[in-house]
Amino acid sequence: MERGKRSGDFETFKEFMKLTQYFNCIHIAGGYPVEPVDIHASIRHLDCLYEKLTLTDKVVHAYSLGAERVEDVMEMVRIAGGLSEAEFQAKPRMYTNINSVSPLQHDYPMLDGAMRMAKRGQPVVITPFTLAGAMAPVTMSGAVALSLAEGLAGLALLQYIAPGCPVALGTFTSNVDMKSGAPAFGTPEYMRATQMTGQLVRFYGVPLRSSGTCAANVPDGQAMWETSNSLWAAVQSRTNMVYHAAGWLEGGLIASPEKFIMDCEVLQMIQRYFEEPIWATTEDDIAIDAIREVGPG
C-alpha cells in the first residue's frame, strides 16, 4: 500500500492472493489481479496457479488462451486434488471465462481452450464484452441483444461438442463516454443492461455472471458508488458469479489493495442483507424483559 502506482509484479500478485484467502466474502481466485510482468509469459500461468493452489483454498481459474495454458492448469488442479482423470471429470473443479470479439465474433484461441475445458467437464463462462456506442449499438436493447446472440452462439457450440457440459452466460454490457470513448461502469445503463440480461438468462435456465466494476481512477467516493451500483445490479439480477468484485479501478487497468478491502466491506454488508429473514417472535427474541426493565421514556 505504501509503494505507489507501479507495474504488476509477482510479489504483488501473491499479496492479492493472500487478501483473497483472508476475506470469506471472496469465493473464487479468478484471473490475475495484477499481471506479474516479471514472470515470462510462457510460464506465467504455471507460477501463478501454483501460488493460487498453495496460498488459497478458493476455486481457481484458467485463462482460455489456447491448448497449452488450459491443459497445464487442468492437470495442475487434478494433481493438487489427488484426483484420477475420471474423478476430475466427474464434477466441476475449476472454471474458465471467455469473451467474444464483438460484434458477432469469437476468438479461436479462446474457443479452443473453452472446448478443451468442456470436454473434460469443467465450467465455461461465456461473457460478451459489448459497449453501447462502440462495438455495439448505442441503444441498450441493441447492445443487450448483441451480447445475448454472441453468448448463446458460444453456449450452443459447447453443448454441441460436449452435451450437458456446465456453462454460464456472462454480461459485460455498458456504455461509453461519447466525448472520450472511454468505457463507463457503474452507470444506470450498466445496471439496466445487467438486469435485462439477468431476466433473459433466467429464461434460458443457465447461471449468470456479472461484475463489480467501476471507472474511477482512485479509491474515492466515485469508485465506491460505481462499484456499489454494479454490485447491487448483480444481486438484483440474481447473479450466480460476480467477477471483479474487489479491488477494481479505472475500468480494470488498476488493481488497488486499498479498494479491495473497501469493496469487501460492501460485499459483507450485501451478504448480511441477503441472509435469511428474521421470523423470531419469542419473548427472548423480542427482548421483552429488557423493554420492561427500561420502561417508558
Enumerate the predicted regions with their spans.
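Charged, low-complexity surface segments at secondary-structure and domain boundaries
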Residues: 2, 61, 254-256, 292-293
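Helix-rich catalytic cores of soluble enzyme domains
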Residues: 2-240
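Acidic/polar loop patches that form or flank catalytic/metal-binding clefts of enzymes
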Residues: 206-212, 241-246, 276-285
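Histidine/acidic-residue-rich catalytic or RNA/ligand-binding cores of hydrolases
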Residues: 221-222, 253-257
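Glycine-rich phosphate-binding active-site loops on the catalytic face of alpha/beta enzymes
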Residues: 233-254
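Catalytic-core signal marking the mid-to-C-terminal active-site face
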Residues: 258-297
